[in-house]
Every structure is written in C-alpha cells, then in structure tokens.
Amino acid sequence: MAEKFFLKGEDKVNMEGVLGSEAVEFFSWSASNHMLTEFTSSRGDLGVQQALCKIVEGSDWTYAIYWQVAKSKSGKSALIWGDGHCRETKIGQGEGANDSAHQKMMDGNKKKMVLQKIHTCFGGSEDDNIAAKLESVSDVEVFYLTSMYYIFPFDKPSSPSQSFNSARSIWGSDLKGCLEHFQSRSYLAKLARFETLVFVPLKSGVVELGSVKSIPEDQNLIQMVKTSVVVSNPPQPKANTKIFGRELSLGGAKSGPISINFSPKVEEELSFASDSYEVQAALGSSQVYGNSSNGYRSDEGEGKLYKEELDERKPRKRGRKPANGREEALNHVEAERQRREKLNQRFYALRAVVPNISKMDKASLLGDAIAYITDLQARIRVLDAEKEMVGDKQKQQVILEIDFHQRQDDAVVRVGCPLNAHPVSRVLKTFQEHQVVAQESNVSLTENGELVHMFSIRAPGPAAEDLKEKLTAASRFALKTRWSVSVIRLLCFARLFVYEHQCLAGKFALYFVDYTI
C-alpha cells in the first residue's frame, strides 16, 4: 500500500493543492504503516444512519460522522470511519463565488482525480468509486469523502480520540479553534468554511458534527446525540448500499444528500468480534481545551466504560494463576500496548493541569508543561523572598532594649531599638545628611490615641525649604515651618502603656520615655 501512495512531481502538487500538505502527509503515513489494513471494522449497517440523518436534516448542521472503535491483532485501538451523513450542498457553497465556469470545471475535475487517487491507493474497487459517479464536487463533499479514509489511533494525540478517552464532549464555535481541532483536515475544513465542530463521545465511538454556521453550545443537543445514536449489535450486512445518495448496483442515480455507509477495502481482512468496541476511558477528570474566549470548552460526557467486559475478553495464559490475582502480559506486544496506554493516560492527565496548550501534539505539550513549571518555580522563589523580608521586619520590630532607672522623685525609662526598625529612621538619616541636630525631642499622646514624636531643629532660612522637601519625601508626613524653627509631627498609631513601679518611696508614674538611637 505504501508503494501505491508514492507521489512525485505533478501528482504531489495536485494532491497538496486539493487536500493540503498535512493531509497528504497523513495519508502517506497511514499507507506506509498499513493503518487501514491493521484496523478493520465489521461490514454492514451499524444502525446509526437514520439517527445521523435526523440530526443533520432540518437543522444547521452540515454533516455528521460516526467514528467507531476498532482493534487490531496487536491489541491497539483506534477510531475509524463507521458511518456518516452529509447535507446536499448548494452550487458554489464553500467555493469562490466569483470563479468562472471554466475554472470551476477545472477545479472540479482536479478534485475528482484526487478523490479517485485516494480511493485507488487504499484498495478501493471501481464498483464503489464514489467520485467517478459525481458530476461535480464541492469543497464540503471533498472534506466529507476524504474523511472516510481517516483513522485516529489512541496512541497518537487527536481531538476525536481525546474526546473518547476523556469521555467528554468538545464544542467549538470559533473558526480558529475549529481549524486547530480539525488538525490535518484543517486545510479542507478551511476551504469548506466550517465554523462549528463538535465531538460527542459514546460507548463505542465518537459522533462528529460540523457546520458552516457558528452554532452556540447546546447541552440538549449533546444529550440527544447520546440517546439517539445507538449502534446495532451485531451489525448486519446491507444488500444494496447507497453511497452519496445514489444506488451503486445500477446506473439509475438520483440526487440527494450524501449518506455513506462504507468502509474502504484493504488488502488484508482482519476479523474482530463486533462487541469489542469498548475501551476504558483514559481519564475521568474535567478538562478545558484552550480558554473560554475562543469558544472551546469541554463538557461532561459518559464517564464510565466497561472495564470488566474488556478484562473478560483478554486472552489468558494457561497453567498456574498469577500471584495475588495480577494479570501478566501475554507477550511483548501486549506489554508494549499496555505501556503505551499508560503513557497516554499520563499525557492526558498532564494536559488537564497545564492551563495554556499551544498545540495538540506531545512535543508541544511537554514544552508547555516545562514552561508552566518554570513559571511556577519563579513564583515560588519570589514568594519565599517576600516571606523572608516580612520575617526580617517582624524580627526587627520586636528587638527592644528597655532600661528602668529610678530617681529620687521620679523614674526614667529608656527604650532602645535598631535605627532601621524605628518609625522615624528616615527623618533622622535626613538630619544626619544635612548635619542638622535636633535641639529638643519629646513624645506625647493625643486624645485620639495617636503617639506624636516632635523635634525642634534650627536651620538657615535658604536651607530650610530644601530640608523640608527632603523630609517630606523621606517620611511622607506633613512638615510645618515657622520662622527658623521646624516642627515635624510624626503620627505613629500605637498604644501607650502606662506602667507603675512599686518601690520603698511609694508609687511613681513613668511619664518620660527617652528613645536611644
């Protein structure tokens, strides 16, 4: 299959012109790794066609796709095309309205050629070649038909698999955010002018809805999709399949909306049980993708997926039962699968706690997580530094030296503290810079409970104004100057404790406090 999709020269240019470089790269990877060969689904009607048609018709939705869970022989799981329905597009919708008729015909032929190329590369037959039976192909139809050959493995990040693994719906009504979640289909979605994208997880798959209109989030619609889209079990093959609204068995084609119940043919046929579409959700916590400004946010989905049924389907080794009831890997492939699933679960958990995610791939997620952790570490260092500064200030405030000296008729209390810890330290430093000596200093208590520290200084007339400005800037308190005497009132809100000392001569009131600087 890889050799069939080898492109060169003009073929590659035409493919990239219609699909975009990311989609071409995806199909090259899928073909080289035989993805559609490894993951196959049961043929026939899944029983969701009528429900998908009901959701799209009579509403603003353009298409609906059901991605079903499939498993490979190696035990890997992926979401592959299950069924779909697309509304019939009007002429010119999703295309340039001013293009000439000849240009539209040339573009239409190029689109049909690209679709036929994809169909042939992935093992399709001429009988079910949809593009060959169409008269014209719109951009919406190109997007829809190309999606048939897409696959979303659980070990690679993608919006459909992320919605299924987290059991939460994704609703996007922002054009930029929609293109981000379309990922490799973003070029096709941009040409089709889709503005709304929704992923709704179910028990056995994911329903994708798209619209060319901006549709606000509606929880009732999500619940309706969960209850109406029910997969038949087991699926029964359908005799006459309608593809793109036309009967493939006979030539009598009639126009109508696109209703595809089709699985691309592959070179190898793998058989799986039809009831093996249930995979344990990788994460159960709430998760936000992007921010609320771009229209994207996750919602509660079906949280419980049946792990017990999965465990019953796992093959077991014969012989002695493992100790403590622990399940052992059957072989290296099974061990590798379990390791990948565990790694993916941790990536989903990491994505849930990182607030800003630039892209959906693992490398970008790790880069965003590293940047987020580095920012948190810087914040911690700043907070620790502020905490130390606050602690140092508190220590300085409590370091006081109190000396009591008794005299004959009174007593003197001397309270000493470091200069930097004193409220008037800036004022005193300003005095020292200007070589000003305080002639008198006293402390008094006002009726309002304010402690007033007053200084009487003497300075020359011209220097008084300069000193006044610097003292105002240093202490941020009012300064009043009268003749050559400046009185600085420093209001310090504090409590004045009056102590009484019992001695032989009687009680003495401590009325004077002298600060030692």
Curated annotation (Swiss-Prot):
Gene Ontology biological process terms from the UniProt entry: defense response; negative regulation of gene expression; regulation of defense response; regulation of DNA-templated transcription; regulation of jasmonic acid mediated signaling pathway
SUPFAM superfamilies reported in the protein's UniProt record: HLH, helix-loop-helix DNA-binding domain
Description of what induces expression: Induced by wounding, feeding with herbivorous insects, infection with the fungal pathogen Botrytis cinerea and infection with the bacterial pathogen Pseudomonas syringae pv tomato DC3000.
GO cellular component: nucleus
Region described as Disordered: spans on this chain: 290-331
Gene Ontology MF, one: protein dimerization activity
Stretches the record annotates as Helix-loop-helix motif: 341-376
Compartment annotation: Nucleus
Protein name: Transcription factor MTB3
